Each structure stands twice: as structure tokens, then as C-alpha cells.
Amino acid sequence: MTLSRAPRRKTVAGASAQQVGLNFETPDDIVCGVDEAGRGPLAGPVVAAAVIFDPSKPMIRGLDDSKVLTAKKRDELYDKIVDRALAYCIASATVEEIDSLNILHATMLAMKRAVEGLSVVPTLVKIDGNRCPTLSVRSEAVIGGDALVKSISAASILAKVTRDRMLLELHQTHPVYGFNAHAGYGTPQHLKALREHGPCEHHRRSFAPVREAHLRLSTGMPLPAGEVIVVSEVMFDDDAFGERGSAV
């Protein structure tokens, strides 16, 4: 899934030559902000967004880390961002890619797709977190960037709203899991549904609670009602990012 905007592709002469430069921001830079949503959930894709703002235009008010905004505010800002951004792209990595690559590398893949899908070529990509995907342009990891860099804040909002809407669609075909309530995260409601119904094709079988629920039901030994599946903190904290994501 990739959504993008802008009528034609633009680039800046010499951008590739600046790739290895030490000056990470010059007045001529076209800065792109990148963030993701959905590293921690037990189900659904991981979604990334890339946003470029026109520096000559007034900045959208109210941009912030999507996690501190209400759903209503995120929806309002989503419409403003897609209307006023110089360019944006929303991309994802599938559940199958998450299970085959691990969540870290699938997230990097979604981010790479978002940047490469932009209709305007950036000269500097600022990414929330402490890792950057392999890109053909300069990139910089910004810890806490979704609250510090406006284009990253915008990307976090696009990614979050898009993914939440995708999980609402999944709820229509798989209502027993309550995706409309938790967006795939490992809440008690979701874990209970996994115990009772087992995982569906949209669950991440590389994640321990899903894998264990599938194993219990496939062997005819469902979890007792009082038994608790231990869920790694990476599933609940979208800022907890590291290789351990593959072993959840």
C-alpha cells in the first residue's frame, strides 16, 4: 500500500554528491520527515509516512507526536497535512514481510518505500528514532523527532491515522478480535480473543503471543481462562526500537 501526492518529480542538482557530506542541513536542503506506526501490535501492517513541507509557506499549527494527540485532532491535522504538504507518501510493510524479515527490518522497508515514493526528491531525510534505512539520499536519525521536527510530527500523524483506518477495515471482516478498539495491540481484550479463536491471517505469527495462541489451539490445548501471556514491552511502546523486535 502506497499513497503519494505531487504532480511531478523534482530533484536538486548535486544532491547525490552531498550524500557523504558532513553538513547535515544547508539553506538549499529539501528536508523530509519520516515516522512509522504499528511496530508493537500483534496484528496488521507497519505503516510509514514521509512528508516534505514548503518552507516558504506558514507551518501548520498543532503538529506534535501523534501519540499525544486525540483521534479527532489527528484526523483534523491529517487533512491539513495532505492538503498543504509539498509532497507526502504513505507506505507499509505487510504482515508476511514482518514475519519473514522481523519487525525492525520490515519497518526500515516501509520507511524506505515512503521516501522513495515521494514525488519530490529530498536532499535530507530526518527519521524519528535511532536508526535509518538505507537510502540514496542523506539521512539523520532524530531521537524524539516526532515531537521536535514538524515534518516528522506530520509523518507520525499520517502513519498513525492511516494504520488506524486500516485496522477499522479489518474489524469489519474480523469483528471477534476488536481491532476497532485496540488497533491490533496486545490488550487483555485482544489476548482473550486470541485464546478463544486463534489468530487470523492478519496476525503476526513471529510475535510470541500470536505464536503461542496458534500452537495451543492447533494442538488442542487452549490456554486456561486465567493464564496470562507475557507480552514484551516493545509491543506497547512504539519508541522501544531494536533488534529484539524480531524475537518478540
Curated annotation (Swiss-Prot):
Function, as annotated: Endonuclease that specifically degrades the RNA of RNA-DNA hybrids.
Enzyme Commission identifier(s): 3.1.26.4
Residues given in the record as a divalent metal cation binding sites = 35-36, 128
- InterPro entries documented for this protein: RNase_HII, RNase_HII/HIII, RNase_HII/HIII_dom, RNaseH-like_sf, RNaseH_sf
Stated family = Belongs to the RNase HII family.
Report the protein name in the record. Ribonuclease HII
Domain of life where this protein originates: Bacteria
Query: Catalysed reaction(s)?
Result: Endonucleolytic cleavage to 5'-phosphomonoester
State the Gene Ontology BP annotations: DNA replication, removal of RNA primer; mismatch repair
* Cofactor (UniProt): Mn(2+); Mg(2+)
The terms describing its cellular component in GO are: cytoplasm; ribonuclease H2 complex
**Cofactor: record remark:** Manganese or magnesium. Binds 1 divalent metal ion per monomer in the absence of substrate. May bind a second metal ion after substrate binding.
Entry keywords, A to Z: Cytoplasm, Endonuclease, Hydrolase, Manganese, Metal-binding, Nuclease
Q: Give one Pfam family, short name only.
A: RNase_HII
Q: Name one GO molecular function term.
A: RNA binding
CDD domains hit by this protein: RNase_HII_bacteria_HII_like
Provide the protein's localization.
Cytoplasm
Q: Give the gene symbol.
A: rnhB
Give start and end of each RNase H type-2 domain: 29-219
